[in-house]
Design a protein with these regions (language model features):
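Short alpha-helical elements
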Residues: 1-192
């Protein structure tokens, strides 16, 4: 009962937003970032997990989480979709949402999945595609993009988020923001 009320009032999202601004100011930065990194993660859902799709690229039946983090890995926006939503579709929508909350973002780093006019023309934000160097083989840490991958690793430590069990996308988003707020609280507590 309480969770549904907090979810519907976007309380977890507002708490995360306030904690991100507080931590940025504590670090001597402006409250609103000027650059960010965007990526997505596909996760499986349970049988009763509500709306889901199939991500053909990763061969996962479930949901896709699009995340926008600042250059230090602070979670700015997290948006779950069914897994069949392409990065280019979810990314453009996420950047449009970001304009309302973080109007000073000028540049976003992304992977090749976001290399589409739907993303680049969604807002006035410059989208820079970070890709592998030609001829490169094996795993190599890509500049800037590792920050958002680290964020996904952090939230996957939360047992409830390792697999998506929520019946609605709105509830899934609320749990993602609650986990993000918990990360920010730990970060602030360590610096105190």
């Amino acid at each position: 009962r309480w969770f549904a009320r907090f979810r519907d009032e976007c309380l977890f999202e507002r708490i995360n937003h306030a904690l991100v601004a507080l931590d940025r100011e504590r670090a001597g930065r402006d409250a609103s970032p000027s650059a960010a990194i965007i990526d997505s993660q596909s996760v499986k859902t349970t049988e009763s997990g509500g709306p889901r799709g199939y991500d053909a690229g990763k061969k996962i039946k479930g949901r896709k989480r699009h995340a926008l983090v600042d250059t230090d890995g602070r979670p700015l926006l997290v948006e779950p979709h069914t897994a069949d939503v392409q990065d280019r579709d979810g990314g453009g929508a996420l950047l449009q949402i970001s304009r309302g909350l973080f109007p000073f973002i000028e540049k976003v780093w992304a992977d090749g999945g976001y290399n589409h006019h739907r993303v680049t023309e969604a807002t006035s934000i410059t989208v820079e595609i970070v890709s592998k160097i030609a001829g490169q083989s094996g795993f190599v840490v890509l500049p800037r993009r590792w920050v958002v991958e680290r964020f996904f690793a952090w939230i996957n430590r939360n047992r409830r988020l390792a697999k998506d069990v929520e019946a609605t996308l709105k509830s899934a988003a609320a749990f993602l923001y609650a986990a993000a707020a918990m990360l920010m609280l730990r970060r602030l507590a360590r610096s105190a």
